[in-house]
Design a protein with these regions (language model features):
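Positively charged n-region of N-terminal signal peptides that target proteins for export
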Residues: 1-4
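Hydrophobic helical h-region of N-terminal Sec-dependent signal peptides
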Residues: 6-14
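C-terminal segment of classical bacterial N-terminal signal peptides
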Residues: 13-22
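Surface-exposed, beta-sheet-biased, low-hydrophobicity segments with strongly acidic/polar composition
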Residues: 24-213
């Protein structure tokens, strides 16, 4: 099973990351469609040695793998934590999914590059990242009671560059990342997420704050 192969390779910290399809679990006749809205963000910890929560699903903010009828299957794996490369975030690991990951540096790095006002290790940069007109923008100036102004994010070009399967980036505590996921068969599909690494224990776990753009 491709999902099992994916998990085993992630567990062994391999270099290559084969793609895996999402498991389709038949619904019982009395099951009703979920009425909860799509989750827009949250905090999630991925554990290197946990077969379920080593991946994250951006649709509901839950663990990407599942035990189904005594089988280990992929449920919805949009982001993975692997020990490869001394600890990496990996995306574009499902069947037909492609991705790009861009490391924006720390909150202080963004403040320095884009010259907006923010506290030391503050949240202005992360909070202000947004999608506008097919590009990512960041705060330029907050005029208080007047309308804030925005500026293009220079790294947006890298985000919208050609995506690839199993895109990866080294994990850095306190760094902000942008992840863009596309589908090689469904050209209309696109998912863009911003991440902040808020805790990291190498070889064990990484905790991220994430939010859909």
């Amino acid at each position: 099973m491709k999902s099992v192969l994916l998990g085993l390779i992630l567990l062994l910290a391999g270099v290559g990351f084969p793609q895996v399809g999402r498991a389709q679990t038949p619904a019982a006749p009395d099951d009703k469609p979920a009425t909860q809205p799509k989750k827009r963000g949250g905090i999630f910890t991925m554990y290197a040695m946990d077969p379920l929560s080593r991946t994250l699903c951006f649709t509901d903010g839950k663990e990407g793998m599942a035990f189904v009828n005594n089988k280990w299957e992929n449920r919805c794996s949009d982001l993975s934590y692997t020990q490869a490369g001394n600890g990496s975030l990996v995306s574009g690991i499902e069947l037909n999914r492609m991705a790009t990951i861009v490391d924006l540096g720390t909150a202080n790095d963004l403040r320095g590059r884009y010259s907006f006002e923010d506290a030391e290790n503050g949240g202005v940069g992360f909070a202000s990242l947004r999608l506008e007109g097919g590009k990512v923008t960041i705060l330029q100036d907050d005029n208080g009671k007047f309308k804030a102004s925005w500026q293009p994010l220079e790294e947006s070009a890298k985000l919208f560059a050609e995506s690839k399967s199993s895109a990866n980036a080294p994990i850095q505590l306190g760094h902000i990342y942008l992840v863009r996921i596309t589908d090689s068969r469904d050209k209309s599909f696109q998912q863009i997420v911003k991440l902040l690494v808020i805790a990291y224990r190498p070889d064990e776990a990484v905790t991220v704050r994430w939010e859909l753009l």
